[in-house]
């Protein structure tokens, strides 16, 4: 049986799915290749191999080197656009030939391990919008905001390119505001907000199935076949934190302990604990995250009392749930519920 999760030292990233584009952008801005590759296990000749791979430790080092040598706030935005328009990435080609946004995002999510294995998405409907909530699948240290910007840049560039507008779309970010003039320049027409409880992109339902300007079923199917062939080299795997959150969500309102989760993932309890420390997290924090996300999703529906929510989340006492929710969001449940219009 193949492994269901990967670690920092597993080569699950293709060099031509991000690294070569990033290096090209940095070199055009005066950075030297040998300095960009310093501290990684990547050699210059590896960059020309169609299926050359690297692991996340090298990827994070590469990002750090580029950001140190290229003091350019637009770098993640440009990288997202470069990925979308790369002729070497079949997944991105398929997005541009998709019938509509719904098909494109389904394609991106299914094959995300080929391009963005560091994120997964929670999708839900809120009033007249579809909301994509971005969750880190593994620890990205101080590169998380950069990588999230790359992903959002790719998605928003796709929408702007295919539908001609970002009107009605909202991007909510947990981070504080940075380079507001640049963000407005690159994402004009977008409603941007910062210091939010989650990273999410809200898209009006009207745009969800609007036909793409470059829709082409034959080209889409051809690109999708190439993505499937690439799965032989990059089989579908998930990072350990994501796998744990997935197990805990399925188990609610029951709570799995560390030994149960480790057994389900084919690990010893000590190995699970050690690997989580490499992701700068721990078992209790991931359980907290699952409960917080489930609580917010249930509260958005507007149908549950605090007692019902406590039972659904595995709390024996509703007061413990209220305290936990206040710690997670800074709000009591009733105040959070009041942010939404349930009519």
Residue ranges, per PLM feature:
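Short, solvent-exposed positions on alpha-helices
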Residues: 34-35, 146, 285
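Generic solvent-exposed, charged/amphipathic alpha-helical segments
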Residues: 23, 67, 109, 152-156, ...
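N-terminal low-complexity or simple alpha-helical regulatory segments
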Residues: 1-128
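N-terminal regulatory/effector-sensing and dimerization cores
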Residues: 55, 83-200, 204-207
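Short, contiguous, pocket-lining structural segments
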Residues: 14, 143, 147, 236
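Extended mid-to-C-terminal alpha-helical interaction segments
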Residues: 177-343
């Amino acid at each position: 049986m193949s492994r269901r999760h990967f670690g920092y030292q597993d080569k699950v990233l293709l060099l031509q799915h991000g690294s070569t584009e990033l290096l090209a952008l940095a070199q055009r801005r005066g950075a030297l290749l040998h300095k960009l590759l310093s501290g990684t296990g990547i050699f210059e000749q590896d960059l020309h191999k169609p299926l050359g791979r690297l692991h996340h430790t090298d990827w994070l080092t590469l990002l750090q080197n580029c950001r140190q040598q290229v003091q350019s706030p637009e770098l993640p935005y440009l990288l997202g656009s470069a990925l979308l328009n790369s002729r070497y990435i079949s997944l991105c080609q398929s997005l541009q030939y998709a019938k509509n946004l719904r098909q494109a995002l389904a394609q991106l999510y299914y094959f995300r391990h080929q391009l963005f294995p560091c994120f997964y998405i929670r999708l839900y409907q809120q009033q007249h919008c579809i909301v994509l909530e971005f969750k880190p699948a593994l620890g990205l240290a101080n590169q998380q905001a950069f990588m999230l910007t790359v992903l959002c840049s790719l998605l928003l560039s796709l929408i702007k390119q295919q539908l001609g507008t970002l009107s009605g779309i909202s991007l909510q970010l947990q981070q504080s505001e940075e380079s507001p003039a640049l963000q407005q320049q690159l994402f004009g027409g977008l409603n941007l907000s910062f210091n939010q409880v989650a990273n999410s992109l809200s898209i009006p339902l009207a745009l969800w199935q609007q036909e793409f300007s470059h829709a082409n079923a034959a080209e889409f199917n051809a690109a999708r076949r190439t993505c499937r062939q690439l799965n032989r080299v990059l089989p579908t795997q998930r990072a350990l934190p994501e796998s744990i959150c997935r197990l805990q969500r399925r188990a609610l309102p029951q709570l799995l302990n560390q030994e149960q989760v480790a057994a389900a993932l084919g690990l010893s309890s000590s190995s699970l604990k050690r690997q989580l420390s490499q992701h700068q997290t721990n078992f209790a924090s991931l359980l907290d995250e699952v409960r917080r996300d489930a609580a917010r999703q249930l509260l958005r529906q507007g149908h549950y009392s605090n007692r019902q929510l406590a039972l659904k989340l595995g709390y024996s006492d509703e007061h413990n749930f209220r305290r936990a929710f206040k710690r997670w969001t800074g709000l009591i449940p009733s105040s959070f519920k009041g942010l939404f219009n349930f009519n």
